[in-house]
């Protein structure tokens, strides 16, 4: 299935999978910029809304993407429907992890521990393998920064993420520079119940969120916003399998996160309240000015100048405008501003102690 339900690369960027149709409006160069900003940073509202972290908003259905949004790499080109397994089948569950953009940069980002996560399955009855992953429809840049279209007053976002399921596991891709390891064994019936959950999760969780935002790097620091990316999909799926009765092996599992550090965020409003006819024109201009350096299709000279502008805004003036749940927030940035981590998050414990899920 091209997508689990209806409907490229970030910390969850998958390997390239073919050229997308239409103009390449999404050729972004900001993966190196994020790394540069993280290095440079290391060197150098309404009270009723303030539930921290802000809950990720879910939707009743997945909207069709706007035709303006075109992917450089086709989303889920070999996708297929999730098969119905026989209840007495034994399904092996594999942890899959490989460097982001391995198809383009090899193990370069692997050395920096910037990894993409997925899940593999193997049916012992049919001996067929399957891969399931969740990633951006229009690549990382569009999920993280908007387009500033001259015919529109508000920033325009091409931000959707979705699940992709297809037959086969590319052993060399996952093993050569990453991880392919058995983490659990489940029944076919348990797999089928998981599949129903995946479809519902995919239809209601429609957009990608790059950043995890919290008050400081300290353990237990206040967290303002959670990311919503490939690793979070894998973690949610593991939790669901544990809920259904899966027993996971005791092995170390680490995941990439991109953190922003800020004081308590200030809620600014949604697109209408900020950019509409009665919106705050000064605030609207400030938000667009902040996003301007992140635009795509820059020459080398423009790209370097944009890096300086980003550094000035985020590190010198300590400002960041975050778009989350289709609403805008102001982040008063704090040292170390931005950081890419590779953290251990343990596999879940079995939650259902009966044999009903087996």
Swiss-Prot record:
Record region (Membrane-anchoring): 303-342
Highest rank taxon of the organism: Eukaryota
Modified how: N-glycosylated with both high mannose and complex type sugars. Glycosylation is important for proper folding and trafficking to the lysosomes.
Keyword annotations: Disulfide bond, Glycoprotein, Hydrolase, Lysosome, Membrane, Neurodegeneration, Neuronal ceroid lipofuscinosis, Signal-anchor, Transferase, Transmembrane, Transmembrane helix
One Pfam family cited in the UniProt record for this chain: CLN5
Cellular component aspect of the GO annotation: cytosol; endoplasmic reticulum; Golgi apparatus; lysosomal membrane; lysosome; membrane; perinuclear region of cytoplasm; vacuolar lumen
Catalytic activity entry: S-hexadecanoyl-L-cysteinyl-[protein] + H2O = L-cysteinyl-[protein] + hexadecanoate + H(+)
Residues in compartment: Cytoplasmic: 1-29
Segments passing through the bilayer: 30-46
Positions of the UniProt region annotated as Disordered: 1-23
Residues exposed to the Lumenal side: 47-358
Entry annotated with the keyword Membrane: yes
Coiled-coil ranges from the UniProt annotation: none
One annotated GO biological process: glycosylation
Disulfide topology: 69-158, 76-164
Keyword Disulfide bond on entry: yes
Subunit structure: Multimer. Interacts with SORT1, RAB5A and RAB7A. Interacts with PPT1, TPP1, CLN3, CLN6, CLN8, ATP5F1A and ATP5F1B.
Chain's role: Exhibits palmitoyl protein thioesterase (S-depalmitoylation) activity in vitro and most likely plays a role in protein S-depalmitoylation.
UniProt record similarity statement: Belongs to the CLN5 family.
Disease: Defects in CLN5 are the cause of neuronal ceroid lipofuscinosis (NCL). NCL is characterized by brain atrophy and the accumulation of lysosome derived fluorescent storage bodies in neurons and most other cells. NCL is found in Australian Devon cattle.
Protein name, per record: Bis(monoacylglycero)phosphate synthase CLN5
Organism: Bos taurus (Bovine)
The encoding gene: CLN5
């Amino acid at each position: 299935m091209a997508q689990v339900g209806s409907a490229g690369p970030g910390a969850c960027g998958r390997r390239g999978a073919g050229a997308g149709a239409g103009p390449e409006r999404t050729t972004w160069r900001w993966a190196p910029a994020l790394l540069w900003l993280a290095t440079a940073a290391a060197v150098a509202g309404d009270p009723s809304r303030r539930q921290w972290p802000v809950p990720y908003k879910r939707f009743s259905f997945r909207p069709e993407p706007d035709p303006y949004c075109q992917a450089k790499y086709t989303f889920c080109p070999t996708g297929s429907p999730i098969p119905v397994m026989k209840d007495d089948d034994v399904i092996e569950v594999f942890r899959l992890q490989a460097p982001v953009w391995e198809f383009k940069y090899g193990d370069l980002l692997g050395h920096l521990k910037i990894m993409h996560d997925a899940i593999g399955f193997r049916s012992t009855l049919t001996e067929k393998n399957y891969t399931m992953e969740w990633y951006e429809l229009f690549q990382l840049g569009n999920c993280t920064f908007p387009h500033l279209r001259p015919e529109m007053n508000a920033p325009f976002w091409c931000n959707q993420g979705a699940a992709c399921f297809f037959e086969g596991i590319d052993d060399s891709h996952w093993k050569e520079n990453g991880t392919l390891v058995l983490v659990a064994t489940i029944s076919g019936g348990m797999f089928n119940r998981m599949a129903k959950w995946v479809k519902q999760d995919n239809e209601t969780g429609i957009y990608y969120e790059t950043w995890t935002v919290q008050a400081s790097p300290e353990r237990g620091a206040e967290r303002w916003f959670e990311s919503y990316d490939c690793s979070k999909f894998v973690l949610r799926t593991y939790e669901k399998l544990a809920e259904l009765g899966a027993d996971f092996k005791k092995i170390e599992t680490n995941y990439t996160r991109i953190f922003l550090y800020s004081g308590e965020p200030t809620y600014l409003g949604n697109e209408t309240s900020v950019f509409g006819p009665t919106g705050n024109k000064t605030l609207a201009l400030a938000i667009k000015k902040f996003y301007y350096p992140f635009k795509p299709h820059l020459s080398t000279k423009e790209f370097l100048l944009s890096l300086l502008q980003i550094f000035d805004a985020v590190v010198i003036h300590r400002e960041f405008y975050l778009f989350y749940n289709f609403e805008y927030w102001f982040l008063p940035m704090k040292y170390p501003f931005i950081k890419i981590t590779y953290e251990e998050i343990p596999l879940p414990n079995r939650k259902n102690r009966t044999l009903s899920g087996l």
